[in-house]
């Protein structure tokens, strides 16, 4: 049963233990006390950058092409791609990043509880 499997793999981390790439969250008004995540958080090595890529669910052909070209230009660089988990540009960004060997982090706007996921 997928719902149970997902719930068993959800972890949390308190703000006192955020890895370096999450520390900017502490600079916003009312930062989160805890972050929930599934899977493994990537190791943040010296020189690795984190880049957010977001866009429309109802993208144009140009939007798709330019997203893929921009990410292709990052091939081989020490970059982690962060995007939503929505259909459209978010999904295109994740797929292209994975195709060229980059690490990705998905941040669904609806939270990670299975019943709340919305593409």
Describe the residue ranges of each PLM region.
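Glycine-biased, small-residue-rich flexible motifs in mid-sequence functional cores and linkers
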Residues: 2-119
